[in-house]
């Protein structure tokens, strides 16, 4: 019998770890590596078995499964010409695939190299080990309790700044939607933010998932008596923040209520459709043969390791997807929507409205980040699907336009170089730095994710050491005020970043929701930290 190997994750019980010579230990994440390092236990990081080229191959392979729902066997999930299975957030799907495929290929390479007789592993990778073990004589032990896995938007991080500290509270998607509906109803009724259907025949601009305080000047410039402006935010409520409400009010930007659009017949049809597609889902999960063919790489089906994840997410969200299709279709039929603006095209909100829009409705994708500026990152930037976007793309500069045309073969007339509605205002702001008696240094770390395959122990170590090093450097200057601005994403690495900062000093202010423009305006020096760098 071959030797024993142990896989450890953050959820593993480390009290049973053996230190025998014939046992080899592999850590699966940064925290388990740190814990063993502190205990002085010899181990290897599993990720070291994958090189950069292999991670890039996994990234490109994962992208090929983005359109899995287009398989002819899944056409039964089309509702009003929209496939409900295709409404899953593209970033969520890609992150799931990257998480699973990276660990899948890592475990495969280790098992091929070590040929163990005994495998000890955490519960969450048992399916992978069972799928990859070469014979039934291999003994498998589980070293953790059952772990409930979730996708990014299964729970919502409700965030708020309290006395300079970011406070977050996780709530379920269902509870979040209920709270959001109550908040929208109360605030919109109080401040007159509801769209008046009397104006439905006037040309209307529809804005998707844009946070008003960040785009205050942009929204103010859109204010006009000639057309309506409606904003729809599902991921981040626009009525939760006082400044957001103020911006909406001043720019005459309105919210739309589903209750104003749905009649009794609509409600009945929606209810029947929810029941119909929920039943189809129950039948779908028994169709393993079809899924084995869809989710296959190099002759190996990885369907067993993602089945439960997709089953859970669609079971939870199918009713939401059905209702969102009816809402979008009704909106386009009752209101004269002439144009759509969005920052993304892969989110659930964006997908449903872009798929449901009438052919005469123009859509504009506003550039959001810097990644396309760099030759080395152009492969990863395809997650934004610029190359597949059907309508117009608005970018910051002619340089960006030329980059898209030359690297993604996008037609030049589809790209408009108009500047950045978010960042252009910075050049016109008057600095308030003189108000600060100290030299303010703003550090803005971007959290690590597995989206591009960068979530490695080595990157986490470099990230932590860099944050601590910067804190130590500026601590020596008494006239320096150090502040941090954390990206307001759903990434779990944000909690790790906060912990690193607070363990160093609880006195350092950490911001999450404050508009970055205001923080930059009041700072003398800005330092960004990114996983890619």
Regions found by a protein language model. Name each.
Residues 1-533:
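Catalytic-core helical/loop segments in enzymes performing group transfer/polymerization on anionic/lipid-linked
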């Amino acid at each position: 019998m071959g030797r024993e190997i142990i896989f450890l994750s953050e959820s593993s019980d480390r009290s049973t770890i053996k230190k025998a010579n014939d046992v080899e230990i592999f850590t699966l994440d940064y925290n388990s590596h740190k814990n063993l390092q502190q205990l002085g236990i010899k181990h290897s990081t599993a990720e070291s078995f994958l090189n950069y080229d292999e991670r890039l191959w996994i990234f490109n392979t994962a992208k090929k499964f983005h359109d899995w729902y287009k398989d002819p066997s899944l056409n039964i999930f089309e509702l009003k010409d929209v496939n409900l299975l295709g409404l899953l957030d593209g970033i969520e799907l890609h992150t799931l695939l990257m998480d699973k495929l990276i660990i899948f290929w890592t475990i495969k390479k280790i098992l091929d190299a070590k040929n163990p007789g005994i495998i000890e592993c955490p519960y969450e990778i048992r399916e992978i080990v069972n799928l990859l073990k070469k014979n039934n004589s291999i003994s498998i032990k589980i070293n953790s309790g059952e772990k409930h896995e979730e996708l990014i938007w299964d729970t919502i991080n409700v965030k708020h700044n309290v006395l300079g500290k970011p406070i977050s509270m996780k709530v379920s998607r269902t509870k979040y939607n209920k709270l959001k509906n109550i908040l929208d109803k109360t605030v919109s009724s109080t401040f007159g933010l509801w769209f008046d259907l009397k104006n439905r025949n006037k040309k209307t601009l529809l804005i998707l998932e844009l946070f008003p305080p960040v785009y205050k000047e942009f929204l103010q410039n859109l204010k006009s008596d000639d057309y309506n402006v409606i904003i729809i935010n599902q991921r981040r409520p626009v009525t939760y923040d006082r400044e957001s409400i103020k911006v909406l009010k001043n720019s005459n930007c309105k919210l739309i209520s589903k209750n104003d659009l749905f009649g009794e017949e609509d409600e009945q049809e929606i209810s029947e459709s929810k029941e119909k597609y929920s039943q189809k889902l129950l039948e779908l999960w028994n169709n393993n043969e079809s899924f084995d063919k869809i989710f296959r790489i190099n002759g190996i089906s990885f369907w067993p390791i993602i089945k439960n994840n997709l089953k859970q997410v669609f079971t939870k969200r199918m009713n939401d997807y059905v209702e969102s299709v009816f809402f979008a279709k009704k909106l386009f039929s009752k209101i004269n929507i002439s144009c759509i603006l969005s920052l993304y095209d892969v989110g659930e909100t964006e997908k449903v409205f872009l798929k449901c829009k009438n052919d005469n409705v123009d859509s504009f994708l506003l550039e959001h980040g810097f990644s396309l500026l760099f030759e080395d990152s152009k492969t990863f930037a395809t997650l934004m699907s610029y190359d597949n976007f059907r309508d117009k793309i608005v970018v910051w500069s002619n340089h960006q336009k030329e980059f898209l045309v030359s690297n993604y073969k996008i037609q030049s007339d589809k790209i408009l170089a108009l500047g950045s509605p978010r960042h252009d205002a910075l050049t016109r702001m008057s600095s308030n730095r003189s108000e600060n008696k100290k030299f303010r240094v703003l550090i803005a770390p971007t959290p690590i994710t597995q989206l591009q395959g960068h979530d490695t122990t080595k990157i986490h170590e470099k990230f932590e050491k860099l944050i601590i090093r910067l804190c130590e450097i500026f601590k020596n200057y008494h006239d320096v005020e150090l502040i941090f601005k954390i990206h307001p994403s759903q990434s779990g690495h944000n909690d790790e970043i906060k912990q690193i900062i607070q363990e160093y000093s609880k006195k350092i202010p950490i911001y999450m929701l404050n508009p970055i423009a205001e923080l930059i305006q009041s700072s003398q020096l800005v330092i960004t930290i990114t996983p890619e760098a």
